[in-house]
């Protein structure tokens, strides 16, 4: 095996390697017009302006960047003065967002290196563990580069002459498919534990290998994620699982023992000997999510979290069923119990937990194929998502495939044929029809949020 080089140290005096335009493949034709407008206006106003980060990396790889980030020596207030369509955001990192319709160009100011901060500097604050809580001390590009995380993300495209500035051999790492942290990996992870999740995400997304020294602390430092605000972890979780590489991200998280810090109840369930069906459902569900992203079909966090949390919810519901609860109420109560525990790790907004609960509470209702019950279920606004979840359960061997096939066939019929099918099922069937007052459940018949 080829020996991998050590990560570069903080050589503050190291000059940038300037890669001229003829020697790289980054073309303005592949940069969005709004990003070019921001770059050119900053330049014409006398400021330095560089495209930086994942946008440059993806262009070098021949990929279409998801977004374009810009860095400059203009302060956030100076950027706001140049663009009427700009607003400043962030307390931890002050940033300018320049909006062009639905596209937002993020503009950051060069940051100073860590050792330049005074201990009582209110613009740079760390906690006792070294985690950066606020970082708004500005510097120049020679300092800014060492504040970035991975060498592949520390490439600067200069709009002045279309060259790329490379301080830490990032272009070589991109070409080699190597993910390498800048500086001492353990110190960088302690500065911002989310970098561990970013390492996993980029490795999954790009198919890069994680360099040995960058990889080494991952499994040992997972506890640092416990101190990250749950709202921030929600956003990072969406990036991990909704970018088209959910299954690979999940496998990396499990490999580095990071998954348990995000989804402890799900991780415990996966460790049980009788969790085969949940493992199949989870991996099939994540693979299905990746396929939908690839096909540009819509995906929702509600369905994603239903997949990730179904194992512990299902087990809790079975315990309640054994105590005499009805199936819908059992799943409703189990959802509440698991969601409350999960919120201490990842703060999932109610606009997603409510439809997630609907999807899961509808599962027992698929067993009832008689008359009006089936027709009402078919008309439920979340029927399609719940049906897709039923298909995953059938594929995992959790319910009979015949049940899923019946609901598939029912949807292919016209309304009159559907009524004949369910009425015939009612007359043939499993249960004597009788009139009774329908009891409302707390979970299965919720209105669309």
Please place each PLM-identified region on the residue numbering.
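Catalytic cores of the polymerase beta-like nucleotidyltransferase superfamily
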Residues: 1-449
């Amino acid at each position: 095996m080829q020996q991998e080089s050590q990560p570069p140290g903080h050589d503050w005096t190291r000059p940038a390697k300037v890669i001229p335009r003829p020697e790289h493949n980054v073309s303005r034709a592949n940069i969005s017009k709004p990003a070019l407008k921001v770059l050119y206006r900053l330049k014409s106003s006398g400021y330095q302006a560089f495209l930086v980060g994942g946008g440059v990396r993806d262009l070098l790889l021949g990929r279409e960047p998801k977004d374009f980030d810009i860095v400059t020596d203009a302060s956030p207030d100076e950027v706001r003065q140049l663009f009427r369509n700009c607003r400043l955001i962030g307390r931890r990192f002050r940033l300018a967002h320049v909006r062009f319709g639905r596209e937002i160009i993020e503009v950051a100011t060069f940051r100073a290196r860590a050792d330049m901060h005074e201990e009582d500097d209110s613009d740079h604050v760390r906690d006792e563990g070294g985690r950066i809580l606020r970082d708004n001390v500005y510097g120049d590009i020679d300092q800014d580069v060492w504040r970035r995380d991975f060498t592949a993300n520390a490439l600067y495209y200069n709009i002045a002459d279309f060259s790329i500035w490379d301080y830490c051999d990032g272009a070589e790492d991109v070409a080699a498919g190597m993910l390498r942290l800048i500086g001492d990996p353990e110190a960088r992870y302690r500065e911002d534990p989310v970098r561990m999740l970013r390492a996993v995400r980029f490795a999954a997304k790009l198919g890069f290998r994680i360099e040995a020294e960058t990889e080494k602390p991952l499994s040992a430092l997972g506890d640092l994620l416990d101190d990250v605000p749950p709202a921030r972890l929600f956003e990072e979780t969406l990036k991990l699982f909704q970018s088209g590489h959910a299954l690979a991200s999940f496998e990396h998280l499990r490999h580095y023992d990071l998954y348990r810090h995000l989804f402890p109840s799900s991780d415990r369930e996966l460790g049980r000997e009788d969790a085969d069906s949940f493992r199949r459902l989870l991996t099939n569900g994540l693979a299905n999510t990746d396929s939908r992203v690839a096909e540009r079909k819509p995906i929702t966090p509600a369905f994603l979290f239903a997949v990730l949390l179904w194992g512990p919810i299902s087990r809790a519901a079975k315990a309640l069923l054994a105590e005499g609860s009805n199936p819908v109420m059992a799943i409703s109560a189990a959802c509440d119990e698991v969601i409350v525990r999960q919120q201490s790790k990842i703060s999932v907004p109610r606009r997603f937990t409510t439809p997630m609960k609907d999807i899961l509470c509808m599962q027992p209702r698929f067993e009832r194929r008689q008359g009006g019950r089936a027709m009402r279920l078919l008309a439920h606004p979340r029927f399609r998502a719940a049906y897709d979840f039923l298909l995953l359960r059938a594929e995992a061997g959790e319910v009979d495939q015949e049940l899923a096939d019946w609901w598939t066939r029912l949807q292919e019929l016209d309304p009159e044929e559907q009524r004949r099918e369910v009425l015939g099922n009612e007359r043939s069937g499993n249960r004597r029809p009788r009139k009774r007052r329908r009891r409302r459940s707390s979970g299965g018949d919720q209105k669309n949020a």
